[in-house]
């Protein structure tokens, strides 16, 4: 199974970008990772077993590229999260609070939470994408949820004061 590059981009660019941004927390680096991902797709000659395999491959490449970019010495200067938040449209005010809290999590929790709740992947799929055990992913999701709960409770308690 193989899609034309522009069709693959149309279907998956938003998800690839969101996955990259969840790691880099920088719109420019997320754009770079997205472009690099689709460039690799365009130059790849192999077919995929299914559309799910294609999507998983794109996300895996984007995650790896985003990690490369975020670890680069030249990329340490990142755009403030607030600058990026202004470009997003949220359905409800609490959506932006939740997104901000997710982006503040340590990377290992942030990526697992993003893939599970924003991309809809199951534990086993996340484990395969990240090269981790399913038990590790479950722990990261549980700990990430606990950190989110605490962060959001603190924020809401501060708002009530």
Where are these regions (language model features)?
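Acidic, proline/glycine-rich intrinsically disordered inter-domain spacer in sigma factors
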Residues: 7, 76-103
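Sigma70-family region 2
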Residues: 36-53, 73-74
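Arg/Lys-rich amphipathic alpha helix in sigma70-family domain 2
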Residues: 49, 60-81, 91, 143
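DNA-recognition helix of helix-turn-helix
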Residues: 63, 67, 130-154
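A short pre-motif secondary-structure segment
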Residues: 112-116
């Amino acid at each position: 199974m193989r899609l034309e590059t522009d069709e693959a981009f149309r279907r998956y660019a938003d998800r690839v970008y969101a996955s990259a941004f969840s790691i880099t927390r920088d719109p420019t680096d997320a754009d770079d990772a997205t472009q690099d991902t689709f460039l690799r797709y365009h130059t790849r000659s192999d077919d995929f077993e299914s559309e799910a395999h294609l999507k998983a491959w794109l996300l895996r490449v984007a995650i790896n590229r985003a990690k490369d970019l975020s670890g680069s010495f030249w990329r340490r200067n990142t755009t403030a999260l607030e600058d990026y938040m202004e470009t997003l449209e949220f359905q409800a005010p609490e959506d932006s609070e939740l997104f901000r809290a997710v982006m503040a999590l340590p990377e290992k929790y942030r990526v697992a939470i993003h893939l599970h709740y924003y991309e809809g992947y199951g534990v086993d799929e996340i484990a395969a994408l990240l090269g981790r055990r399913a038990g590790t992913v479950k722990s990261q999701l549980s700990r990430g949820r606990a950190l989110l709960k605490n962060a959001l409770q603190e924020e809401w308690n501060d708002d009530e004061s």
